[in-house]
């Protein structure tokens, strides 16, 4: 079985997360996707309560599974109640799935901090790493494979996405609609609980919808 791990704070999950998961499934032939809700050790402020982020991540996996994919949420990192590290989760998954192929899915923004990640030099012994690089980003902004300790297991994939959680929070706080930015179920949840309303965030403008290719 081919397992993939995709971790984020999911504050909140958005259509970029959904698109990345579905794209990775088709591209890599993933059998099972584990969506892990994390606390970023480089950003001590946890943001929304864990219960909200977990529930929104569950809604994200439901959206993924509606397409015929198989995904599930892991709250293992949150249960530790301390800064979480990817290497610890990978080791935990290895105890559960010792014989299966494991791939870590990483966004470009997160990968910029890769050299600071705990025990990054051990990743190749635990999993492959696929970095989803923004198409509009210049290549020199992403660390080059040769300066990464475990370069043999790292692959780069171009991925077009202009959405971020920061943008979603900013749009909600400004009173504008996020219906094009997040999955419908996540949208309803944010509105129901009044998340992000009246908060101050820094973000760019809402991306223009891209025309469909014929």
From Swiss-Prot:
The keyword DNA damage does not apply. Catalyzes the reversible adenylation of nicotinate mononucleotide (NaMN) to nicotinic acid adenine dinucleotide (NaAD). It catalyses: nicotinate beta-D-ribonucleotide + ATP + H(+) = deamido-NAD(+) + diphosphate. It holds the Pfam family CTP_transf_like. SUPFAM superfamilies: Nucleotidylyl transferase. The lineage of its organism: Bacteria, Pseudomonadati, Chlorobiota, Chlorobiia, Chlorobiales. Belongs to the NadD family. The gene is nadD. This is Probable nicotinate-nucleotide adenylyltransferase. GO terms for biological process: NAD biosynthetic process. InterPro entries: Cyt_trans-like (IPR004821), NadD/NMNAT (IPR005248), Rossmann-like_a/b/a_fold (IPR014729).
């Amino acid at each position: 079985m081919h397992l993939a791990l995709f971790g984020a704070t999911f504050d909140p999950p958005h259509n970029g997360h959904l698109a990345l998961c579905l794209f990775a499934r088709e591209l890599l032939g993933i059998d099972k996707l584990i969506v892990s809700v994390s606390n970023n050790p480089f950003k001590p402020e946890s943001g929304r309560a864990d219960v909200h982020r977990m529930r929104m991540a569950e809604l994200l996996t439901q959206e993924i599974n509606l397409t015929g994919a198989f995904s599930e949420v892991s709250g293992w990192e949150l249960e530790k109640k301390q800064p979480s590290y990817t290497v610890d989760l990978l080791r935990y998954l290895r105890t559960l799935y010792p014989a299966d192929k494991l791939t870590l899915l990483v966004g470009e923004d997160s990968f910029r901090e890769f050299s600071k990640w705990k025990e990054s030099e051990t990743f190749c012994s635990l999993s492959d790493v696929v970095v989803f690089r923004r198409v509009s980003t210049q290549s020199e902004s992403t660390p080059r494979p040769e300066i990464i300790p475990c370069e043999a297991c790292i692959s780069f994939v171009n991925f077009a996405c202009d959405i971020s959680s920061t943008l979603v929070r900013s749009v909600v706080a400004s009173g504008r609609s996020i219906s094009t930015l997040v999955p419908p179920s996540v949208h309803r949840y944010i509105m129901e609980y009044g998340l992000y309303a009246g908060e101050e965030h820094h973000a760019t403008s809402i991306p223009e919808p891209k025309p469909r290719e014929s």
